Amino acid sequence: MENEAFVDGELESLLGMFNFDQCSSNESSFCNAPNETDVFSSDDFFPFGTILQSNYAAVLDGSNHQTNRNVDSRQDLLKPRKKQKLSSESNLVTEPKTAWRDGQSLSSYNSSDDEKALGLVSNTSKSLKRKAKANRGIASDPQSLYARKRRERINDRLKTLQSLVPNGTKVDISTMLEDAVHYVKFLQLQIKLLSSEDLWMYAPLAHNGLNMGLHHNLLSRLI
């Protein structure tokens, strides 16, 4: 019995050693075997690169198509805006022609105002030219020069007469001339009274009665 147990133990130990050697040989063979990673690439197990390479062109085509669509859409959006701008500019150009104000077009209204203003300017310029010509004609006419000098002399005489006639500067020209006539008659009466031997004493009375009309009576007596 003891021999059989010993034999069995030896067999088990031999089997264990055999298994160990086989495992070690398998490990050495596994270690000495060429590396499968060197033979098989990662792309064989996970072909993401090929997928990306195959789809890259499609992605680029899609992106280009999308960008073209975006550009086309932007151009389509810009075209109506350009049309709107052109239409607004055309409206601005045509509005002054078609605008109305108080039942009358602004163009005709403005044109009529301009014509009126031009007419007024032309009329004023013509009137000024006529006045200038008239003034030049009057200044160059010898008769007008003589008449002007005569008026100046008359004005000087009137001023002198106003200073001689009593209260002549306090009244107008016509009243002053009437007073001047009466004053001259009174002076004539005074001269006659003073030159008469019989009536010289009436001279002060004639002077004081100038405003009462006594000088008329004295003149009638002298005549």
Curated annotation (Swiss-Prot):
One of its GO terms (molecular function) is DNA binding. Residues 138-187 form the bHLH domain. Coiled coil: none annotated. One of its GO terms (cellular component) is nucleus. Residues 64-113 are annotated as: Disordered. It holds the Pfam family HLH. Disulfide bonds: none annotated. This is Transcription factor bHLH139.
